[in-house]
Amino acid sequence: MIGTPYTEGARRAMLLGCGELGKEVAIELQRLGVEVIGVDRYPNAPAMQIAHRSHVINMLDAKALRAIIELEKPHLVIPEIEAIATQTLVEMEAEGLNVVPTARATQLTMDREGIRRLAAETLGLPTSPYFFCDTETEFNQAIGKIGVPCVVKPVMSSSGKGQSVIRDVSQSAKAWQYAQEGGRAGGGRVIVEGFIPFDYEITLLTISAVNGIHFCAPIGHRQEDGDYRESWQPQAMSADVLAKSQAIASKVVEALGGYGLFGVELFVKGSDVYFSEVSPRPHDTGLVTLISQDLSEFALHVRAILGLPIPNIHQHGPSASAVVLVEGKSKNIRYQGLADALAAENTQLRLFAKPEIDGRRRLGVALARDKDIESAVNKALDSASKVKVIF
């Protein structure tokens, strides 16, 4: 049962993290009459701007997180980011709190070690070789065992922060220092992974719902500096490789438990599929589904977490997204060129309304459909390039 916002019977959902993905989740929640409470570490975050009300707290502060949940008494807590005091969610879930998809899933995927050990050691899924390291000595030993090229990531980081590829051992010291600076909790543990010379990488959006496991068409994407620049759907792949990908995604999602949409990242090399990472929430590469599907990844996530069935997911054809990425410093961000950006057929634009920029930041995404993937990607890139950001 869903009530009406601001009434005694309202169904209340609390978003922990109010970025651009949380904003789209909030919109879908409101379309189904859910009262939305936004929580983030800074004011006027994108989802806060449309939530029924919002709070600013340090979500890594266990006491502050517990206090705001006890104050609002939400029926659902929806983590949108990793930087959260997840042990508090585990404790409160045991007390009856409904965490989406589960507190365990949120905790396991908060750091790369938990989810990698689940996938490789518990589920026996194919992954790249890896070592976890606490010291620079262990780090150098791991590189010696794995060899170069290899990939280095802080176990707790996002959006490519602290991530680098070592192509020569002379780069080791610099990579260690960069990883120590890029972790969410400051310096600390890192993962060293063997580099898989993959043919392509995909995000397989996988939904666990009351009526079973469902998949969106595979999404291809291009990464740069550890963050996505373009994504497209569908990624061309053989039926055999798709079946292998879906089998891996199903195992991971079922092991994590709960209802919701999961972004499962996979590497494909020939007919082999390797597990990379998983997010127990909508994925940034899945922004393409805002134009490529009748139900976006956000609509699917909300249906699933509300206990509603997932119908057949219709994919509209070759579609792409391209980010509007800007570097600068301002608290007065304005946009020009929108008419040019939207002049072509089957193009859309999402400006995230982030309140400020200090360095490099993703401020929007251009979306496009066309006759084939290459044309759709080029159209999205052209649209994004016409958005002029004024500081």
From Swiss-Prot:
Q: Is Plastid a UniProt keyword of this protein? A: no
* Pathways per UniProt: Purine metabolism; IMP biosynthesis via de novo pathway; N(2)-formyl-N(1)-(5-phospho-D-ribosyl)glycinamide from N(1)-(5-phospho-D-ribosyl)glycinamide (formate route): step 1/1
PANTHER family documented for this protein: FORMATE-DEPENDENT PHOSPHORIBOSYLGLYCINAMIDE FORMYLTRANSFERASE
Gene Ontology CC entries for this record: cytosol
EC top class, in one word? Answer: ligase
Task: Indicate yes or no for the key word Metal-binding.
Answer: yes
Q: Choose any GO biological process term that the UniProt entry carries and state it.
A: 'de novo' IMP biosynthetic process
Name the record gives this protein: Formate-dependent phosphoribosylglycinamide formyltransferase
Assigned keywords, A-Z: ATP-binding, Ligase, Magnesium, Metal-binding, Nucleotide-binding, Purine biosynthesis
Protein purpose: Involved in the de novo purine biosynthesis. Catalyzes the transfer of formate to 5-phospho-ribosyl-glycinamide (GAR), producing 5-phospho-ribosyl-N-formylglycinamide (FGAR). Formate is provided by PurU via hydrolysis of 10-formyl-tetrahydrofolate.
* HAMAP family per UniProt: PurT
- A UniProt-annotated Pfam family: ATP-grasp
Binding positions for Mg(2+) per the UniProt entry: E265, E277
**Gene that this polypeptide is encoded by:** purT
Assembly, in brief, is: Homodimer.
Q: Which InterPro entries does the annotation name?
A: ATP-grasp (IPR011761), ATP-grasp_carboxylate-amine (IPR003135), ATP_grasp_subdomain_1 (IPR013815), PreATP-grasp_dom_sf (IPR016185), PurT (IPR005862), PurT/PurK_preATP-grasp (IPR054350), PurT_C (IPR048740), Rudment_hybrid_motif (IPR011054)
Task: Report residues binding N(1)-(5-phospho-beta-D-ribosyl)glycinamide.
Answer: E20, L21, E80, D284, K354, R361, R362
Kindly list any coiled-coil regions of this protein. Answer: none
EC number(s) given by UniProt: 6.3.1.21
Give the Gene Ontology MF terms in alphabetical order.
Answer: ATP binding; magnesium ion binding; phosphoribosylglycinamide formyltransferase 2 activity; phosphoribosylglycinamide formyltransferase activity
The record lists the catalysed reaction(s) as: N(1)-(5-phospho-beta-D-ribosyl)glycinamide + formate + ATP = N(2)-formyl-N(1)-(5-phospho-beta-D-ribosyl)glycinamide + ADP + phosphate + H(+)
Task: Please list the residue ranges annotated as the ATP-grasp domain.
Answer: 117-306
Which positions does UniProt annotate for ATP binding? R112, K153, S158, S159, G160, K161, G162, Q163, E193, G194, F195, I196, E201
- What top-level branch of life does the organism fall under? Bacteria
The record's similarity note reads:
Belongs to the PurK/PurT family.
